[in-house]
Amino acid sequence: MTATASHTRARPLGASEIEHATRIAEPDFDLLDALYRTDDPDDQARLLARVVLSAFDNYYAVSRRIPALAQAAFEARDWPVTVRLSKIRIGLYTACIDQLVPLLKAGLPELTTDEQLWPTAEAELLAAIEGRYEADFAFAFWQSLRRKLVSDEWRPVSYDAGSTARRTTSPAAVLKTTATTLPITAEVIAGILDEAGFRVPWRDRDGDAALAAQAIETALEPLSPRPGEPVKIEIADSGFLRNRGACLVGRIKLRDRGDMPMRNLPLLIALLNEKDGLVVDAVLTDSDELQYAFSSTLANYHATNPRYHELARLLYELMPKRPLGTQYSCIGFHHLGKVAVMSEILAEHRKTKEKLATAPGFKGTVAIAFTMPSSAYVLKIIRDHPTDDYKFDYFDGLDEVLRKYNLVHEIDRAGSMLDNIIYSNVKLDRAMFAPELLDELLEAGIGTVTLDRGALVFRHLIVQIKLTPLPLYLANASAAESRAAVINLGDCIKNNAAADIFNKDLDGRNYGVSRIRKVYLFDYDAVEPLTSVTVSRDGAAPGEFDNGMVFRPQEMLEGLRIDDPGLRRAFRDAHPELMQADYWEGMQQALRDGKVPKVMNYPASRRLRR
């Protein structure tokens, strides 16, 4: 964040400015030439390590510039640029590797088969990155490039060599502390807002600070606060920016009082940049609400502080229901999150000795989903061919379905679609699998799964956060919980539409409910761009679709299979526009015009001005 705030509207970023700032530098051709020319194995190892590290440094420099650009776009209210920056960032890692791989293959083809060179070169790389903060990230980059060249199996390798082995990270290094006494005043909150340093005038800073202080005071009441009691407000020295919004994140700490233990309250101050100035839109003080705001179902945050380990640890402490690996992913460090998630899955198995078995719910027609009972994750493969219950006349095939899962990973998921981690060439011990699942994987996933002695090798493996399928949830939930879920289902469908995503298989079985009782779409084999769908105003013909691409809004409830009349009525009353063609055509036009629709990332009840 910047140190001071000015009172002039920020300048929009130009297209050439963004292109220049996010352009990946070319590989070091002098180093490449030296690598190609030498026949000495030690020189080859040393030069290969230098070439790859140079490429990583190019990537990392650009990736660290993007959060500052995102802040500038937020300050200028340049919403299309914020979306563009998110897309650039998420594709940057792969683009940088893809830039280098063909050069190495062409100039040193033996890299794909030389089993002696890689260990020696890896030792050179580890020595070169010793002591660097981002050493683990550089090593992840090395592993990614090696797999591209060698087509080796994916392993959750983390950087832990020598004296730079990372100990348990504390978030203290990224926290700024304000010490005061209860009650927390508007002046204290105003000071925290000023320290954020946005280069945008506030619409009503003092009024917002007063409302925020009041919201915090209400949230503290269950902790039995006393007037004059010492309190610390810890705020991350980082802006978190995403699309139209920004937020300040931290916690409020009340120390041990004798009759009360240490008490912590999560804190998120959500900011919007409106036409007439910066405003505090909401204050969140509940861990589950923070989890929704930082959900992997949303686009990733740009964090302006580069200390990603401390930020991920802070987020985990604030949202302990959410695995640590996904905390890395939600601030854009997918490849570190990828390592952390697989490490967590393997650790879960070692700890519980549970078997991977078919996931609860209805049998997937396109995917086979499996999990361990106490795991936080669900794993999936795509079938070679859909089951007989498949609804559509034509199946696009494995590669096209994987493309759709990748598409969802790369877009703003608008708070209503699970992110996916897609692994290639993963080997898992055969003993991890229940016999029935093992048989199904080998029979229905011949193009994806092979048996290699005592292990299963997955050509592709999709991992998602575990949800309860919506029909199962409704079968066991109370009337109030069920009503809230179907209303949230409508919000989910609207948010998907705002992200230009339409699920042509509008079946409740493709949606699930999270631990924090939010509804998400989690199956993507039937997703299409909303802008490519024909919305029909003619309800005469039966069925939802003609040729798979004509949508009749008036038939939505039949497609969702909500059988309970009361729940159908609740859905219809809460979201009547979803059954109207005007809504869908209006959303399509907004998307074609390049507008960025607003998406609600937190409960409306937490907004300061409703």
From Swiss-Prot:
ATP binds at A359, P360, G361, F362, K363, G364, T365, K380. The active site is at D419. Its EC number is 2.7.11.5, 3.1.3.-. It comes from the Bacteria. It is found in: Cytoplasm. GO terms for molecular function: [isocitrate dehydrogenase (NADP+)] kinase activity; AMP binding; ATP binding; phosphoprotein phosphatase activity; protein serine/threonine kinase activity. One of its GO terms (biological process) is glyoxylate cycle. The keyword Cytoplasm applies. Keywords: ATP-binding, Cytoplasm, Glyoxylate bypass, Hydrolase, Kinase, Nucleotide-binding, Protein phosphatase, Serine/threonine-protein kinase, Transferase, Tricarboxylic acid cycle. GO terms for cellular component: cytoplasm. It catalyses: L-seryl-[isocitrate dehydrogenase] + ATP = O-phospho-L-seryl-[isocitrate dehydrogenase] + ADP + H(+). Its main location: cytoplasm. Bifunctional enzyme which can phosphorylate or dephosphorylate isocitrate dehydrogenase (IDH) on a specific serine residue. This is a regulatory mechanism which enables bacteria to bypass the Krebs cycle via the glyoxylate shunt in response to the source of carbon. When bacteria are grown on glucose, IDH is fully active and unphosphorylated, but when grown on acetate or ethanol, the activity of IDH declines drastically concomitant with its phosphorylation. Belongs to the AceK family. This is Isocitrate dehydrogenase kinase/phosphatase. The lineage of its organism: Bacteria, Pseudomonadati, Pseudomonadota, Alphaproteobacteria, Hyphomicrobiales. The gene is aceK.
